[in-house]
């Protein structure tokens, strides 16, 4: 254990108070020559760390799993999951929770090492991670944070000095991931599958205390827990859809109880608007396509409700009815939040009957003309309609007149409407070709400057700054669709 606490470590281990079936205590596997390649200064400060101390060899050794800070209690979490619809017992196959950092404001965050070596849940995996996917998770999770979308975050990336073997030999790395917690829908499925009502209750009680203390007292606390998770996920999925984010692997083990986005493996942001957009190389049926995400979230939440049935009510029929009633509320909550978000994207303060139609007409035209999702709303926000097939079409010009007259009918000024649009339409997103460009420079050439410049731009997605304009350019047309892989 490293005892130098000038770095600011302040660890607790509340997860280890759960029954032992929920985890396995195991130390990380040391690596040969760790090197810090990325540290998140602002996140470090918010967690109560001293960033300069974290750059020292003693702390780099912690990020690499070669040492443990005082108070660490490394463990791999057990969970289950429906992966593309098929149920499996799973667990952290290459990640370890080393503890929960208590911040100066009293908040609690999991500190997890990802790529820290094999665990009892590794199956045939080596427990390691490659540098490219770890940097990719860093870039996209930080972009999501800047977009004000709940997400796990990345504190540090270290290279291990050792190769990782996938299809080819790749440089190894470990990511330090930060999350409100790593409790998933799959964690509840795991408890339910094991058949211990006591364990299921322990997990639910722990989750309420940690994430939803305001529902500690009511009689129907487990129903209230389900309600809160449904609300959080409805809000999260609406936010994904509004910025064109496609997660790619919405298995139940990747749906957090806290409502944070987790697992940035095959995710990507949509370029031209298409409800059927899929990037993941393994999602051959389009199960997790952009337009399917709200439905898949409801499906995943139904699996949570199923897992909770033994503790929702002592009468199984009544418990089933409660579960069905609560799940049925997801679609209405999601639709309302998405619609409200779309109105903001178009500068609409008030309500008019034809607002739904106005939004749907625009989206249909965007799909028909393969218009870039982000740049269409960016152009509307700037009120500069460049020569594109969409903007040149007679049907868009007709729609534009309807939209402008709609803006004129509301009490708020057009100036206020455009300001609201600016705050809800990101000027830039982590476009796939720019992310790949940054990863190629870092992994192949050891040049992190491209990534740093990209991260700097992505940190202010609503700034509409002139020096960001190069990141607004869409990728060159190609016959080869962009594909993502589950490297994270």
From Swiss-Prot:
Gene Ontology MF term list: AMPylase activity; ATP binding; magnesium ion binding
Residues that bind Mg(2+): 254, 263
Residues annotated as catalytic: 253
Catalytic activity: L-seryl-[protein] + ATP = 3-O-(5'-adenylyl)-L-seryl-[protein] + diphosphate; L-threonyl-[protein] + ATP = 3-O-(5'-adenylyl)-L-threonyl-[protein] + diphosphate; L-tyrosyl-[protein] + ATP = O-(5'-adenylyl)-L-tyrosyl-[protein] + diphosphate; L-histidyl-[protein] + UTP = N(tele)-(5'-uridylyl)-L-histidyl-[protein] + diphosphate
KW Phosphoprotein (keyword) present: no
EC number(s) given by UniProt: 2.7.7.-, 2.7.7.108
Cofactor: Mg(2+); Mn(2+)
Residues noted as binding ATP in the record, renumbered to the chain: 91, 93-94, 114, 126-127, 177, 184, 263
InterPro entries in UniProt: SelO
Keyword set, alphabetical order: ATP-binding, Magnesium, Manganese, Metal-binding, Nucleotide-binding, Nucleotidyltransferase, Transferase
Family classification: Belongs to the SELO family.
HAMAP family, sorted: YdiU_SelO
Function comment: Nucleotidyltransferase involved in the post-translational modification of proteins. It can catalyze the addition of adenosine monophosphate (AMP) or uridine monophosphate (UMP) to a protein, resulting in modifications known as AMPylation and UMPylation.
Protein name as catalogued: Protein nucleotidyltransferase YdiU
Lineage start: Bacteria, Bacillati, Bacillota, Bacilli, Bacillales
């Amino acid at each position: 254990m490293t005892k130098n606490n000038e770095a600011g470590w302040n660890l607790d281990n509340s997860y280890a108070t759960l029954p032992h079936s929920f985890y396995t205590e195991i130390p990380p596997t040391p690596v040969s020559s760790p090197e810090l390649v990325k540290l998140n200064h602002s996140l470090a400060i918010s967690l109560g760390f001293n960033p300069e101390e974290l750059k020292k060899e003693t702390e780099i050794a912690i990020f690499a799993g070669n040492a443990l800070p005082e108070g660490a209690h490394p463990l791999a979490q057990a969970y289950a999951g429906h992966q593309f619809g098929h149920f499996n017992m799973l667990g952290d196959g290459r990640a370890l929770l080393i503890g929960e950092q208590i911040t100066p404001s009293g908040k609690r965050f999991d500190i997890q090492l990802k790529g820290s070596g094999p665990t009892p849940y590794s199956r045939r995996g080596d427990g390691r991670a490659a540098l490219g996917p770890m940097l990719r998770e860093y870039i996209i999770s930080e972009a999501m944070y800047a977009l004000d979308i709940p997400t796990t975050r990345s504190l540090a990336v270290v290279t291990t000095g050792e190769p990782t073997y996938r299809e080819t030999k790749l440089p190894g790395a470990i990511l330090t991931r930060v999350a409100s917690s790593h409790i998933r829908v799959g964690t509840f499925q795991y408890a339910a599958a094991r058949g211990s009502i006591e364990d299921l209750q322990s997990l639910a009680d722990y989750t309420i205390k940690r994430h939803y203390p305001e529902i500690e007292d009511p009689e129907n606390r487990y129903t209230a827990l389900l309600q809160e998770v449904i609300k959080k996920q409805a809000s999260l999925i609406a936010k994904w859809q509004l910025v064109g984010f496609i997660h790619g692997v919405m298995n139940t083990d990747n749906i957090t109880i806290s409502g944070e986005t987790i697992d940035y493996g095959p995710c990507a942001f949509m370029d031209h608007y298409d409800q059927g957009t899929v990037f993941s190389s393994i999602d051959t049926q389009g199960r997790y396509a952009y337009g399917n995400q709200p439905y898949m979230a409801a499906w995943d939440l139904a699996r949570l409700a199923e897992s909770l049935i033994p503790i929702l009510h002592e009468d199984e029929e009544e418990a089933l009815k409660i579960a069905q009633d609560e799940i049925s509320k997801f679609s209405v909550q999601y639709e309302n939040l998405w619609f409200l978000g779309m109105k903001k994207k178009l500068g609409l303060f008030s309500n008019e009957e034809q607002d739904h139609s106005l939004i749907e007409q625009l989206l249909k035209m965007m799909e028909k003309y393969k218009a870039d999702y982000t740049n269409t709303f960016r152009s509307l926000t700037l009120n500069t309609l460049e020569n594109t097939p969409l903007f040149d079409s007679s049907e868009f010009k007709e729609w534009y007149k309807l939209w402008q007259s709609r803006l004129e009918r509301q009490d708020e000024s057009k100036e206020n409407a455009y300001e609201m649009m600016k705050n809800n339409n990101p000027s830039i997103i982590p476009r796939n070709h720019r992310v790949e460009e940054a990863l190629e420079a870092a992994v192949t050439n050891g040049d992190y400057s491209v990534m740093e410049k990209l991260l700097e731009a992505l940190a202010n997605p609503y700034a509409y700054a002139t020096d960001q304009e190069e990141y607004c350019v869409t990728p060159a047309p190609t016959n080869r669709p962009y594909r993502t892989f589950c490297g994270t």
